[in-house]
Design a protein with these regions (language model features):
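Generic structural concept
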Residues: 5, 9-12, 37, 92, ...
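A short secondary-structure junction motif
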Residues: 15-22, 43, 72, 98
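N-terminal helix-turn-helix DNA-binding core of bacterial DNA-binding proteins
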Residues: 20-61
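Short, locally clustered residues in the helix-turn-helix/winged-helix DNA-binding domain
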Residues: 38-42, 103, 130
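Residues in the recognition helix of alpha-helical DNA-binding motifs
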Residues: 65
Length: 133
């Protein structure tokens, strides 16, 4: 077996075989409410259809998530005055605070990992990530 296959096997067994609490938290951010909050924070108001496309989810799933976020006071839905079939979703101040908290939590988690790796390994990791993305 070549080093590439061995490295791949080792990486995958660590990623998928040992689900850490942090990994679970980070994967939550890739779907559900955290994703919608971050998407609206980055991109501004969007329609549910745009959010579904960005999330690669059904509009029904997005509608359920939007209802939950609306109940929490984190988003508003407004009908487009020029076309009443279109609904624009925006973050409220509470939603923006949640987005900032999510970003800060992610920063802290990643910085903790980097502190455990040390400066040299962190710089190597970042250089490799930049090179291959």
């Amino acid at each position: 077996m070549g080093y590439e296959q061995e490295a791949f096997r080792k990486l995958m067994s660590n990623i998928w075989g040992k689900k850490s609490r942090m990994q679970e938290e980070m994967s939550k951010g890739a779907k559900g409410e955290p994703f919608i909050v971050q998407e609206l924070s980055r991109e501004g108001p969007q329609t549910p259809t745009q959010l579904a496309a960005a999330m690669r989810a059904t509009t029904g799933r997005v509608s359920t998530l939007l209802s939950a976020l609306e109940k929490k006071g984190q988003i508003t839905r407004e009908i487009d005055p020029n076309d009443r079939r279109i609904v624009h979703v925006s973050l409220t101040e509470a939603g923006e605070r949640r987005a900032e908290k999510q970003r800060e939590d992610m920063r802290e988690a990643v910085c903790w990992i980097f502190s455990q790796m040390g400066e040299r390994r962190t710089r190597e990791f970042v250089d490799l990530a930049v090179e291959f993305t």
